[in-house]
Amino acid sequence: MDKKVYRALCQEVDGRTTKCFEVFNYMINEYEDRGKTRRYEFYRKQARKELVLNLVANKKMMSALDATLKELYDGKIKVGFIEQFRSAKWLSKTFNYYLSTNQTLIEVARENGVIDEDETEIVIGGDKNESK
């Protein structure tokens, strides 16, 4: 993996995240203009769908990046030491980018009422008792 692949993957996640935030904005504007209307509920449902799609896609990509990194460290991918170091650096950067994107999506969704607090615990994968 190199900088070119990293940029391509980041552009992909940025595009999906931008679309998700646009739907969030439609929902927020509708609520501010008219309150809880049918259109607001429709936009909220759409925002929830976009959020789930983004989180699932990012999670799958993070799993693939993690598996590739493990293969690299286990020696299943045969490259020189310098190339291994560079690949590990870009894999780690990409993984962290996807992770921070997921955290941002969850925070924005929680702040704007797209998901409820108990749903946030499920999405993050924790239990309310564990987070104390």
Task: Locate the predicted segments by residue.
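Generic short N-terminal amphipathic or hydrophobic helices
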Residues: 27, 76, 114, 121-123
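Acidic, low-complexity, intrinsically disordered interaction modules
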Residues: 33, 37-116
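Serine/threonine-rich, low-complexity intrinsically disordered segments
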Residues: 19-20, 39, 103, 122-126
